[in-house]
C-alpha cells in the first residue's frame, strides 16, 4: 500500500513512477478525487457534530429554564439524521479510496530498469560453467519418466494437468533438496517456521495478492480462506497488526511449504515437466528490517540464494527485472535463473524482492524507533529456493549419456549415500 499522504503531496511523481509499471495516470486522479470528497465530508461531519453538541447544550439549558425546546429538538433530530447520512457516505468513500489505493503497485526504485515487458531486464552477473555434454541432453521430464522417478500421467489421472507423483529416488531427491535448503538457511541465521497452509483474506491482502490477483489462487468454497500461493503470505502476516520490538530487528524467517497456484493466463506455457505446476514445494525466505537497512538486506538475501546454487554446482545468472515485470509489491526484484541444457536457456528459480514499506503498510507491521515514534518496517522476500525447479535443474545438468543422473556432492548425505540414480 502506498502512503496516501505522499500521493496527495506528490501526485506528478507518483504518476511518473507508476506509469513505468503500466498504471494509467487517470487512476491516480480518480483516487485523489475520491480522497478529496472523503476529506471534505469528514470536515462537514465534524462541523455538524459540533453543531449537534451546541444544540444539545441549548436544549438542556431551555429545559432547565422550563422553556419550550421543541424547535431545538427538531433541529437536533435533523442534524443527527444529516450526520448519519454523511457518515454512511464516508463509509462508502473510505472503501472506495481503500480499494483504489489497494490496486496501485509499489513505487519502483530509481535503479530498476524501465520497461513495460520483461525485455530490458539487466544481467548483473553470471556464475558457473555450463555442462559440456558429448551427447544430446534430454529434458528433465523425459529423464524422470525414463528413470521411473516422475509420473506425470498418474498425476493427470488423479488431479489433472500440471500435477505429478514423485516416486522412489525422485521423492527422496525432492526431500533431499528441500532439507538441504532449510539446513543452509538456518545455518545462515534464518529461523525455521512451519506455518499454516490456509490463510484468511486479511492475510492475502496484507502481502498484496488481494484484491488484484484473486484469479491466481485457489479459494475454499463458501469460506474466506485461500490455499497459500507462497510461504511469503503466512510468514509476513505473522507480524500483521503488531509492533516488533526494535531490538529484535532484523527478523529472518524461512519455511518449507507447498505452494498452490491456478496458473491463470499460463495456458500453453511449460505444459510438461516441473517448471509450472498447480502444486509444488518451495522454501521461502522473509526478512523484516529497519528502512535504512533494506537495500543491504536485499543484496545479502540475493547472495545467500546464489550460494545455494553454487553449492549445488548449477550455473546461473542474476538479473534485475524491469519495472513492469517485477511483482506488484516489489520496489526492486533480482531474479536468479538457472541453466537448463536441454532448453539451452536460463529459467527462473528464485525471485528476491525488497517491498520497502509497501507490505508493512497493508499489514500494519511497525516498530518503535529510538525516539519512541512508530515506523513501518521494510519487508523482503525471496525463494530459497523453488524445490521442483531445483530438482529439474539437477536432472538436466547432472544427466549422463546412459540415462542415469549423478547426485550433487552436497546432496549425497541427504540421499543416504546414493551417488547416482539409475534404472
From Swiss-Prot:
<dbReference type="InterPro" id="IPR010978">
    <property type="entry name" value="tRNA-bd_arm"/>
</dbReference>
<keyword id="KW-0067">ATP-binding</keyword>
<keyword id="KW-0436">Ligase</keyword>
<comment type="similarity">
    <text>Belongs to the class-II aminoacyl-tRNA synthetase family. Type-1 seryl-tRNA synthetase subfamily.</text>
</comment>
<dbReference type="InterPro" id="IPR015866">
    <property type="entry name" value="Ser-tRNA-synth_1_N"/>
</dbReference>
<feature type="binding site">
    <location>
        <begin position="230"/>
        <end position="232"/>
    </location>
    <ligand>
        <name>L-serine</name>
    </ligand>
</feature>
<dbReference type="InterPro" id="IPR045864">
    <property type="entry name" value="aa-tRNA-synth_II/BPL/LPL"/>
</dbReference>
<feature type="binding site">
    <location>
        <begin position="348"/>
        <end position="351"/>
    </location>
    <ligand>
        <name>ATP</name>
    </ligand>
</feature>
<dbReference type="GO" id="GO:0006434">
    <property type="term" value="P:seryl-tRNA aminoacylation"/>
</dbReference>
<keyword id="KW-0547">Nucleotide-binding</keyword>
<dbReference type="Pfam" id="PF00587">
    <property type="entry name" value="tRNA-synt_2b"/>
</dbReference>
<keyword id="KW-0963">Cytoplasm</keyword>
<dbReference type="GO" id="GO:0016260">
    <property type="term" value="P:selenocysteine biosynthetic process"/>
</dbReference>
<dbReference type="GO" id="GO:0005524">
    <property type="term" value="F:ATP binding"/>
</dbReference>
<keyword id="KW-0648">Protein biosynthesis</keyword>
<dbReference type="InterPro" id="IPR042103">
    <property type="entry name" value="SerRS_1_N_sf"/>
</dbReference>
<comment type="function">
    <text>Catalyzes the attachment of serine to tRNA(Ser). Is also able to aminoacylate tRNA(Sec) with serine, to form the misacylated tRNA L-seryl-tRNA(Sec), which will be further converted into selenocysteinyl-tRNA(Sec).</text>
</comment>
<keyword id="KW-0030">Aminoacyl-tRNA synthetase</keyword>
<comment type="pathway">
    <text>Aminoacyl-tRNA biosynthesis; selenocysteinyl-tRNA(Sec) biosynthesis; L-seryl-tRNA(Sec) from L-serine and tRNA(Sec): step 1/1.</text>
</comment>
<dbReference type="InterPro" id="IPR002314">
    <property type="entry name" value="aa-tRNA-synt_IIb"/>
</dbReference>
<feature type="binding site">
    <location>
        <begin position="261"/>
        <end position="263"/>
    </location>
    <ligand>
        <name>ATP</name>
    </ligand>
</feature>
<dbReference type="InterPro" id="IPR033729">
    <property type="entry name" value="SerRS_core"/>
</dbReference>
<dbReference type="GO" id="GO:0140096">
    <property type="term" value="F:catalytic activity, acting on a protein"/>
</dbReference>
<dbReference type="GO" id="GO:0004828">
    <property type="term" value="F:serine-tRNA ligase activity"/>
</dbReference>
<dbReference type="GO" id="GO:0016740">
    <property type="term" value="F:transferase activity"/>
</dbReference>
<dbReference type="InterPro" id="IPR006195">
    <property type="entry name" value="aa-tRNA-synth_II"/>
</dbReference>
<feature type="binding site">
    <location>
        <position position="284"/>
    </location>
    <ligand>
        <name>L-serine</name>
    </ligand>
</feature>
<dbReference type="GO" id="GO:0005737">
    <property type="term" value="C:cytoplasm"/>
</dbReference>
<feature type="binding site">
    <location>
        <position position="383"/>
    </location>
    <ligand>
        <name>L-serine</name>
    </ligand>
</feature>
<dbReference type="Pfam" id="PF02403">
    <property type="entry name" value="Seryl_tRNA_N"/>
</dbReference>
<comment type="subunit">
    <text>Homodimer. The tRNA molecule binds across the dimer.</text>
</comment>
<protein>
    <recommendedName>
        <fullName>Serine--tRNA ligase</fullName>
        <ecNumber>6.1.1.11</ecNumber>
    </recommendedName>
</protein>
<dbReference type="InterPro" id="IPR002317">
    <property type="entry name" value="Ser-tRNA-ligase_type_1"/>
</dbReference>
Amino acid at each position: 500500500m502506498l502512503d496516501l499522504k505522499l500521493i496527495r503531496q506528490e501526485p506528478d511523481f507518483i504518476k511518473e513512477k507508476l506509469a513505468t509499471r503500466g498504471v494509467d495516470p487517470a487512476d491516480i486522479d480518480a483516487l485523489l478525487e475520491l480522497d478529496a470528497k472523503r476529506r471534505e465530508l469528514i470536515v462537514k461531519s465534524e462541523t455538524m457534530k459540533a453543531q449537534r453538541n451546541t444544540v444539545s447544550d441549548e436544549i438542556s439549558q431551555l429545559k432547565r429554564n422550563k422553556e419550550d425546546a421543541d424547535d431545538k429538538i427538531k433541529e437536533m433530530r435533523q442534524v443527527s439524521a444529516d450526520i448519519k447520512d454523511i457518515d454512511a457516505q464516508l463509509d462508502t468513500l473510505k472503501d472506495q479510496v481503500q480499494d483504489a489505493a489497494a490496486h496501485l503497485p509499489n513505487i519502483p526504485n530509481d535503479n530498476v530498469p524501465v520497461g513495460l515487458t520483461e525485455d530490458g531486464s539487466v544481467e548483473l552477473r553470471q556464475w558457473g560453467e555450463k555442462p559440456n555434454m558429448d551427447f544430446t541432453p534430454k529434458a528433465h521430464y523425459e529423464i524422470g519418466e525414463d528413470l521411473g522417478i516422475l509420473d506425470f500421467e498418474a498425476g493427470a489421472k488423479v488431479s489433472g494437468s500440471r500435477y505429478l507423483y514423485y516416486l522412489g529416488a525422485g521423492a527422496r531427491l525432492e526431500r533431499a533438496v528441500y532439507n538441504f535448503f532449510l539446513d543452509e538457511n538456518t545455518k545462515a541465521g534464518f529461523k525455521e517456521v512451519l506455518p499454516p497452509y490456509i490463510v484468511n483474506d486479511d492475510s492475502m491482502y496484507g502481502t498484496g495478492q488481494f484484491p488484484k490477483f484473486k484469479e491466481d489462487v485457489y479459494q475454499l468454497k463458501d469460506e474466506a480462506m485461500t490455499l497459500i500461493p507462497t510461504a511469503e503470505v503466512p510468514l509476513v502476516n505473522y507480524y500483521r497488526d503488531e509492533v516488533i520490538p526494535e531490538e529484535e530487528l532484523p527478523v529472518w524467517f524461512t519455511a518449507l511449504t507447498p505452494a498452490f497456484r491456478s496458473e491463470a493466463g499460463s495456458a500453453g506455457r511449460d505444459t510438461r515437466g516441473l517448471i509450472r505446476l498447480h502444486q509444488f514445494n518451495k522454501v521461502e525466505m522473509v526478512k523484516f528490517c529497519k528502512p535504512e537497512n533494506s537495500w543491504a538486506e536485499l543484496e545479502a538475501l540475493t547472495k545467500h540464494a546464489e550460494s545455494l546454487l553454487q553449492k549445488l554446482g548449477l550455473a546461473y545468472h542474476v538479473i534485475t527485472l524491469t519495472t513492469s515485470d517485477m511483482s506488484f509489491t516489489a520496489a526492486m526484484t533480482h531474479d536468479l535463473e538457472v541453466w537448463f541444457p536441454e532448453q539451452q536457456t536460463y529459467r527462473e528459480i528464485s525471485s528476491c524482492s525488497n517491498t520497502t514499506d509497501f507490505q508493512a503498510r497493508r499489514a500494519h507491521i511497525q516498530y518503535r524507533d529510538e525516539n519512541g515514534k512508530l515506523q513501518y518496517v521494510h519487508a523482503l522476500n525471496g525463494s530459497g529456493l523453488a524445490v521442483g525447479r531445483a530438482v529439474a535443474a539437477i536432472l538436466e545438468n547432472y544427466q549422463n549419456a546412459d540415462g542415469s543422473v549423478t547426485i550433487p556432492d552436497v546432496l549425497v548425505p541427504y540421499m543416504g549415500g546414493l551417488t547416482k540414480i539409475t534404472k
